[in-house]
Amino acid sequence: MAVTVETLDKLERRITLTLSADELKNEVESRLKKLARTTKADGFRPGKVPMSVVAQRYGYSVQYEVMNDKVGQAFAAATGEAQLRVAGTPRITEKDGSADGQVSFDATFEVYPEVTIGDLSALEVERVTTEVTDVAIDRTLDILRKQRRTFADRPQGEYAVDGDRVTIDFEGKIDGETFQGGKAEAFQFILGEGRMLEAFEKAVRGMKTGESKTFPLAFPADYHGADVAGKEADFLVTLTRIEAQNLPEVDAAFAESLGIADATVDGLRADIKKNLEREVKFRVAARNKQSVMSALEKVATFDLPKALVDNEMARLVENARADLKQRGIADADKAPIPTEMFQPQAERRVRLGLTMAELVRANALSATMEQIKAHIDEMAQSYEKPEEVVRWYFGDQQRLSEVEAVVIEANVANFVLGQAQVVDKQLPFDELMGA
């Protein structure tokens, strides 16, 4: 069939769809007859309800359904004939003055842009690498020891020091009034681990069991408790118990308690290094991928379909609402979230998505099943029962699709790094893990 396409804007198009009125009428009658076989109505046997009753009950909804189906089919056929890649959902409006026996509609829609990728060899992309050092292994060992430490009461008269578990009663007042969350009994925390404000810990450090102390404390302006943020309180603290920590020795017994196959100190350190290297690999890949994505924005300039940007903005708003709900914000569903605030982020995501899709298409960068399985196997190694994790991923197509997307992004990143001017940078372990 001949399809006439009007260009309304850079990406906006319009086509006219013409349907046969008789064809629409016949389809409506056919569907109503099918419904009549199962329609029930008082005073009539099943399947014997008059067509006039069936039409009165279902006529409007069936007409709407048929019109939607036929217009959708005609639109798909017309855009396929014209070889148009439709972005978003078309706006359909009925035209006046159609010829006898016909019903005409205008379909207005956007098409995907022609994505042209610039010279990748002109890009400068930073690629980081990170080594797992003995210092990082030692720090992990310290964490493991603390997870398995025990505590014992300090002798009467000894001072509280960092690493001790202290039990206190406290009451804080602002302008002479106790504030919410400012009073507790038998409250425990470990000195020096940053659970409490530094000024609070400093006051408790050096106290003895049974000792009481009063001191002022200024809450930071960005303190998570909005009622006290930026205010000064007066605290009364009584220290009721001090327990010194006992850290296990790093020896074969400690390695065995952790389930290390090679239950030696060297075996334990090797196992820690392997796990840290796995985590470093994922973090380095994520950081390098981000560098690639930022660079790609410089070589991909094209118009964006408004429909895709609008859809992405709506998705980001829903994500923001979900985040508010998770934080326990009341009436998160009704919270006024301006859609426009997400427009720059949505435009960037759409642009990157279209750019990556073109790179994947033009350079055969789709994920293979071997790559997907290898990625899942590698992730599973950080769990106690890797085989169960693998089965969990392969048991759901949505989860597999998520892994596939990650692998495709990695393929694109590696391809771009192979084409661009790469600036290698050694990133300290702490900086990578703190990112």
Swiss-Prot record:
Its EC number is 5.2.1.8. It comes from the Bacteria. One of its GO terms (cellular component) is cytoplasm. Involved in protein export. Acts as a chaperone by maintaining the newly synthesized protein in an open conformation. Functions as a peptidyl-prolyl cis-trans isomerase. GO terms for molecular function: peptidyl-prolyl cis-trans isomerase activity; protein folding chaperone; ribosome binding. It is an enzyme of class 5 (isomerase). It holds the Pfam family FKBP_C. It comes from Leptothrix cholodnii (strain ATCC 51168 / LMG 8142 / SP-6). This is Trigger factor. Belongs to the FKBP-type PPIase family. Tig subfamily. Keywords: Cell cycle, Cell division, Chaperone, Cytoplasm, Isomerase, Rotamase. It is found in: Cytoplasm. The gene is tig. Consists of 3 domains; the N-terminus binds the ribosome, the middle domain has PPIase activity, while the C-terminus has intrinsic chaperone activity on its own. GO terms for biological process: 'de novo' cotranslational protein folding; cell division; chaperone-mediated protein folding; protein transport; protein unfolding. It catalyses: [protein]-peptidylproline (omega=180) = [protein]-peptidylproline (omega=0). Residues 163-248 form the PPIase FKBP-type domain.
